[in-house]
Amino acid sequence: MRKAPKLAAVMTCCAISVAAALGGCASSSDTAILNTDPPEKMYADADSLMNRGKFDDAARKFEDLDRSHPYSAEARRAIVLAAYAYYKAGKTPEAIASAERYTVMHPGTKDAPLAHHIIASAYFDDMKTADRDQTATRKALEQLKILRSRYPDSTYARDAENRIRIAEDNLAASEMETGRYYQNERNFVAAINRFKTVVTEYQTTRHVEEALMRVAECYMALGVVNEAQTAVAVLGHNFPESKWYQRAYALLKSEGLAPAESNDSWITKAWKAVPKLSLGGPG
């Protein structure tokens, strides 16, 4: 019975030690999370780091500012500048995450165009060639179109327009790559679906001429003559000097056929009202 007090004393000492250790950890953690420097100083320090090219350090400093002083005037801009600093540091996932956070928390604000520009730029830089996965291209295009539609007067709108053309051309090239593969494998329906995407979604790219010609080839192979004739008619009307029109016209002529537009064709509808054409050959 005399041993009980000793055991109680030992247990009490252990409890005090554990509590002290936990208290010390909490204190250390709180110090790491919350910076007691005023937000103006933290912002100036982060800005100085960025100006000296220390982008990774600057990004973390901006994040520290947002975490320590979330309701300060500097905190909101710190989020988008953290995204920019991460982008300059080559840390794409972190840049996108910070910029997306800004667009969710502060849509329509002064720096929203910059946030979308950062996201678009990060994905645009990660675009792959036409024979590879186009996820980054599609995400870049989505953000670029947001810039064009929501912020047409922003400093990033003109750059967005140029990049949209490049991204759409890349996507069209990818569809053509896959479509030609299916055509070579004589899977004409699958090939048409790929070429159709180019015709309906990427009419302003350099690939649409070949897409129309290959649509004609595939429909001829399937015996769907009226669609082939429509494809050649639309091709000839819009690109009369194209080598692809010459090839498509020769294909019809070899079968005793000529270009003829069908108003019920998806091709006509895709190009809206296509004027009636002369049924002569290319000049």
Which residue ranges define each predicted feature?
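Acidic, polar-rich low-complexity tracts and alpha-helical solenoid repeat scaffolds
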Residues: 2-7, 20-283
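Bacterial N-terminal signal peptides
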Residues: 11-21
